[in-house]
């Protein structure tokens, strides 16, 4: 610390000896610079040999790190003693001394870069030492620290950005990165090899069979260390998951499997599970599939065998969670389609069945082992909820299964029926089905299915029940109940869907009425239910569309008493645009009378709301009256084109009322009196006397003429 002492003396004795002290300080700094240069030369040689020339080098970086730390402390003390103010004084006295001090600071910065590289070199040597002890978690930690230092990712060391920038621009930086990636690859390879020794998965194929063996080490501590390190080191589990899915999970569900479980394999050091099954395609595969209880039991043995690798990787994820992400979708679908779908077929089987309880217990085990997420993977839960529905459908045998398949089809795949039966024809002959669009699933598939049923020859012996008796009723009941469930969201959100479902119900009603001679069970009630169901869903959609209009009109306000402003017209146009959008999707779908009735109802609600808003005004200026007249004109113009025939708009009950309101917006007091005509004029058809009086008070100033006109409105 001689250099530091020199500087102390410099500031303690700035008198006649000032020049001498400056020279001594300069000498101390120069000496320090020489020491740093010699040290950096040695460090540079060490780095070049390791990361540039790749020469044999057995020097430990610890020696350099200790020396670097000591030099850094000396430089810091030296610079701290001089300080910025002192440096300014020295600069005035000696430019050379100030330059030497700045050089010293730059050398300190370079020393920090060298120290950063030496730390990396030291960590690389620590990795080699940890690898020799086979401590994989320590190696994993060291590799993480290396990555942080190399890439500057969340490093805990106090390293300035400038040091990182200079370090990453050095020639040796790329070599250090390569060395890191080589070590990471070797670590991954080593972990995989050790994992494969602890978890041995093998498969032997024969001409007609396959034997799969899972041999898992019982050394839980070592196994968990390896598994945790492997899965945290960017491990790709695709190969492992594919093996388990293709060779274990799928066969356990789809095939009869011989299972052998040995907890004391290889002298008690391993657990072994052996699966043997045929790979020959059976002619009658459904008869050879295992019972669901066998499937569940075999699954439990598989999970029990693999539980040793199910380590916790973090607070929310286990190894089985990772495996589950790759296999659970296929596994759950297979369980549903090929294992659980075989529900009881008789009442006795149904009463004695424990399927729901068994499925719930099995699902809990999958959840407990973290293979599935109970909040996201609800396939098994949904199955238990729908168990009774599956049972009832099973009773109806294959015909109801076909019906369910038809019900699942898109309602919007539609076709035109009765193209020649226009509204005029139907009005003169109510037995005709009107021209409209019907879902192909109903018009083609479902009706053909029912026609095949009614055409079935009577092969049953006299006095025995018809095996297909009541099936038409069951089919229609299934259609009525299942379509609203299957297409619930679309029926609510897509207007065309609800109109199609209404048409489908009416078409099926028409078909039932045409087949009364076939003695369809419950014919009257079926007709009523079909009609009420179709009407119900159409009404829901019309009410929903009306609520949209009312929601828009809820913002209809008269902000200025003298002028209408732009907001009311914008809202009215928005309502008309909403009706136009509905027209675009509905115009060709329902029968003409259904379409007209629905739009008349929607326009009625819209016009009534508009009229009420106008009557809420207590004072209407001439300008506002003119603007209201123009606004009503927009409605009168746009509303009529919503119909096939513009003249059909007159069926809107409030249509004349709206036209009269437009007239009154431009009428004089005399015209008001004439239109009322002592209670027998045209206004009396739609307005009460109080309403007309209110409008006169709002439109005209308080004069004797207004008072006289009001007295005539009685």
Swiss-Prot record:
Claim: Cytoplasm is one of the keywords in the record: yes
Functional summary from the UniProt entry: Required for accurate chromosome segregation.
Locations listed in the record: Cytoplasm; Nucleus; Chromosome, Centromere, Kinetochore
PANTHER family in the cross-refs: CENTROMERE/KINETOCHORE PROTEIN ZW10, CENTROMERE_KINETOCHORE PROTEIN ZW10 HOMOLOG
Family: Belongs to the ZW10 family.
Protein name: Centromere/kinetochore protein zw10
First and last residue of the signal peptide: none
Main location, first listed in the record: cytoplasm
Domain of life where this protein originates: Eukaryota
GO biological process: cell division; endoplasmic reticulum to Golgi vesicle-mediated transport; meiotic cell cycle; mitotic spindle assembly checkpoint signaling
